[in-house]
Amino acid sequence: MMDNDDALLNNGGPQSGAETVYGTEDNNMVMSEKNDQVVSIVQQLAGSIYQEFERMINRYDEDVVKNLMPLLVNVLECLDASYRINQEQDVELELLREDNEQLVTQYEREKSARKQSEQKLLEAEDLAEQENKELATRLESVESIVRMLELKHKNSLEHASRLEERETDLKKEYNKLHERYTELFKNHVDYMERTKMLMGSTHSQMSTASDRMEVSRARLNPVARSSGPVSYGFASLENSVMLDTETICSVGSQSDDSGPPSLQNELDMSLPSTAERGAATDSLQQQHQATSPQSPPDTSPVVPNVPPANVGRSTTKKEQRSDNNLYQELSFQDNEESEENEIVTGCWVHPGEYASSANDNYFGMGKEVENLIMENNELLATKNALNIVKDDLIVKVDELTGEVEIVREELSAMQQSRTKLRQRISELEEELKKTKEQVKQQNTEQEENDVPLAQRKRFTRVEMAMVLMERNQYKERLMELQEAVRLTEILRASRTVDNLDKKSKQSIWKYFSNLFTPSNRPTERIADGLGGGPMFRNTGGGSPAHSHGSPSRGSGDNRLTLAGSQPPMHPASAGLANALVMPKDYSEDGGSERISARRREQYRQLRAHVQKEDGRLHAYGWSLPINKANQEANPSRHSGGVPVPVYCNPLAEASPHMKVFCAAGVNLHGGFTKDGQSLIPADSPYAPKSTLKITEITSPTAEQSVEALDRQIARASLETLEPETQLSSFVWICTSTHAASTVSVVDANQSATVLDAFPICSSHLLCIASVQGAMESDYALLEQSEVVKAGEMLQRPGEGTELLGKVEFVRVKPKSEDEQNSNSKPQQQQQDEEEAKEATEKSNEPLPPVNAEEPLVNVEAIKIRQALPGAPQRLSSGNSGSDGNQANNNNSSSTGSVLFATKSLNPILGTKEREDPPMTSVGPTMWMGAQDGWLYVHSGVGRWHECLHRVLLPDAVLAIVHVEARVVVALANAQLAVFRRQTDGQWDLNSYHLVTLGDRNHSIRCLCVAGERIWAAHRNKIFIVDPISLNIVHSLDAHPRKESQVRQMAATGAGVWVSIRLDSTLRLYNTHTFEHKQDVDIEPYVSKMLGTGKLGFSFVRITALMVSCNRLWIGTSNGVIISVPLAEVQQKTSSDPHGQMPLCCMANAQLSFHGHRDAVKFFVSVPMLQQPNLNGGLTFVNKRPDMLVMCGGEGYIDFRINDNDMENSIQLEPNQTIENRGDKSYLIVWHVSQR
């Protein structure tokens, strides 16, 4: 030992750089360090530790630090490494800071560059805008030019048409002149013939006359031809006229030279020539139209037998129109004729001169004709001049019209520009006014800062009117809120308790917890306070045994249960007549001693009022009228008239802040595929048997008479079943906290056992509905629907400003995460489940140890199972590894599910959870609507936690109903969403129809199915809608005020009961005639039964409504439950072909002493468990099955017992107080026998 000490002292410390040996032969460790590699701080620390160890070795021994030194060395090494890492990180941090500075500099540079680019962009936009304006201006000018050209084109067309009309008029005038000239020529010829016959005196005179006749004959042919319509105005005939004249003259001269002239020859030649001239004159128009071919140039010049006139006529085929007027043509013709006659005969004599030389008496008419022709020519010339002037004027008018149009367009453009400039000026003036007002306001504010408030400027009239109007609106809202707050405060005051400190009270309850045993409880006092009600006893929570007598002790969880005077029950419900628990539900802090004393006095008055007989009898927790009590005096003989309470307990003991919102029974009917196969196995007790198949019931196949009769009986029994009797005994209850919403599945026959519980979403679930599986009739209805006939795109415009009746088709675009919904849950649902897990971890109660790999959501399930009576605890610390692996497999197969440890078999399919086949929406489904607009569809058969479909709707979902193979969803924006099945039987949530029923600012509060129609409540109106055609069949006003909204509706038979918000009156309407049948006010009844005044029972508001078991079930806002039997006389004597009218009378009403401390949330009616037949299926007999009516609400209260008695009758859990029991949601179940 001394040698080791000397060696240690000689070696010095770790700063010497030498090696130091510690320990014995079995445990030695060498530590060598280099000063340049070790951090200085670690070196100093190691030196100080070395000195301490040296003192310890000197004082004690080497063995003291033998085992500690290696550990310390490791610590120092780790510290050194951490220091080095820290230094490296400091260096990296400096580098990162430099990089950050560079990035900031670059960011600033990029920011400035972006500003410059934005500035350039703005400049480019300005340039583009200016170019657009210039182009627009050019476009306007081009358009004006185009319009001007179009106008000119139009004017030119009009001018051309006028020219054509002028040409037509000239042709008509020419024809008239030609006829006139022909008549004059005929008169002249006749005159000449008479003259020649009178002349016979001398031969010289006759020769002279014959010469003149020849000359006149030579002139007649060209004159007749030139004066006719064929040669007039055509330049091509001028040469032909000259040639014909020469030919005729030559022929005539030859004939004259061939023989001696005589009077007889001249007369013989003149007569046929005259006749030919007349015929030629009459047939000029016909010869003009003829198309005889011309003779070739090398033929014989003239045929002697052909008259000379025909030769001239044959040359008028290709004549062209000349541009000469009538005067020019006539003058040209006269000149031509004179030249021809001079050439042929050598001299030309005017007819006037001939007439004067021969005989002035006979030839005076020709001069008059010539005068007339001259006058006519002058008139024609004047007319032509006037026409020319007129044409010039028309052209000038057209030019002026075009200029006027151009000026008009320019004027309109100037007016538009002036209007734009005025608008711009007005805008600038408004901006200037606003700027001036702002400047004035700023100046005024600056001035008013130094002015007291009393001396400042007052409001104007407009501002005062606006302020008053806003004040009135706010005042109306304030009054409504004050009324709601007053009712809430009254109800809250009715639930206040004595002034007790929470901490002291909790400690006292813990300290004296052993004193509250069943033997020390004042059960006798409770039994005495029940009046004519049933006795109570203490039994085990899971024991189905009954004891009829004094209270006895149970072996399990102690609960207050019905005993003694309980009626005989159905054998299947033997396990239900146990454990009617009536715990107290207090959650508010106590007030002063004066308030607690007043509270006790109020409950004493209420208890005294309730215990009054007043002609009523108390039985089974109900207050019965005297006439009903006489009928129910012998319970054994007639026990089916009064509902018997069989269960009352919180839904989830471990979740005090979880509130129930809604619930629905599961309808397991249907589930047939298109080929007729059922999704539910045949060995399941809920499987549809052959006697109940619709296809076999309605099939027209040949059967034996007995089998056919059995099927008809089965069909009739199936049709006469009430809707609630077709449900199963499973109930889905939706509960919500501030963070998540959860669904709990319970069996009403064993309400204390929660089969499954799983989260749905983070929002509140507002409604739930059960939808039966696909029936074979649904496929035929789907194929024959109007929506399919319209190509799935049925749309219809709305009416009015609210678009009432508008139908629009919505198709949801598929998303990638929705496509993977069948394999894994969506991200939103996983987030919702995580929030639900966080919400379930808030309880501080002890839990049994569970597997570390199991999800935290199961902790909530275990908490609930611990609190439920009679629930076996199968998950404990003693689970084997195989069980843990099995639980892990279950959780992995169903991601995010919440499964109870007690759930081993599916009660419907009879299989284990992990062995359940994949579910589809062809089978029975449960539809849930959330406040955020999501609609969730889960299977009602198996794998309850898995979401089959979901869709986001435009607004919150408030109600869901199923009718005629359609699911109709009411939204908060006054729309109905209608879903239908696909051709394979699954529900199609990717496409649906929206039907608008009113203003989008108000919601559709509730839906109801009456027959084959849907009753939808929107504000104070009720719309009856056909779910197939989506037409609004009828609408009615349930209340005269629009502000009074319809809140609940319940249909049965031929009537629909309707309740109004903030109203205690129920209204009954006929489903077929839509007539108002009856009004029932429940407020006087509640006030009579429970008293009025300070407890707030006079303010009755209906919050839940249901018709079941031939009863009208009513739940109020203060927790009172009323059951009103329907009129039996109406049921027996009704002759309505459409159904029975559900009339009722409040004189027969029954009030339950078991109620809730807050509003009643829901009623659910499901049948009790049916006895299976030999084949394993359910049998339906003629008698109606017994029903279980479940009611849910917040807290529990018995109106017959005061607070102190109820506190003494409560058994608390180990770490539980009365305060946290007041926040729980309670379920109350009644058994109603219909036999």
UniProtKB/Swiss-Prot annotation:
Residues 25-113 form the RH1 domain. Its main location: cytoplasm. Residues 282-293, 874-897 have a biased composition (Polar residues). One of its GO terms (biological process) is regulation of JNK cascade. Keywords: Coiled coil, Cytoplasm. Residues 84-184, 366-493 form a coiled coil. Residues 294-307 have a biased composition (Pro residues). GO terms for cellular component: Golgi membrane; neuron projection; trans-Golgi network transport vesicle. Residues 529-543 have a biased composition (Gly residues). Residues 1-22, 278-325, 520-572, 813-852, 869-897 are annotated as: Disordered. This is JNK-interacting protein 3. It comes from Drosophila pseudoobscura pseudoobscura.
